[in-house]
């Protein structure tokens, strides 16, 4: 059997979180449950992340909980490409088997009981995580590094491209406000608290 392996290597050293027990099969499929938010009936979001930005997504979950009382379920997505391949295969099968019970894609299966809007953040352009939009049935927001490349510290670059923990938190709060689950004043308060300039140029334009 001929097998081809590939590895994506990032230029950042950090301690990788421990793999959740029983997640091996889902990791291979491209999406796995990393950590569930707390229980309760308050606002809840689903946070998806991949690569080095997943650390910012984890930090955003803590900000949402501690600063705004919002619970976040965390999902690791090591392969959005694998997720869209699976989804398209399921779409094709459902198209060709109209008299049988429709199958669910891996994304749909993982999120079928999830509550709240879904926010995805990656170190790639937004189109990367946009690929799975047809399989996300809740409101879906994608964050990515669209724009011209430049040199600076990781912290400043992630702020510039609007993919750091504060921008992930803001996107989650805005999605909750759009869904009517929190007041829009909360989003405005987050802009002030995290010193996010509403007149900041779009990274695509500078």
Locate the predicted segments by residue.
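Thiamine diphosphate
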Residues: 1-206
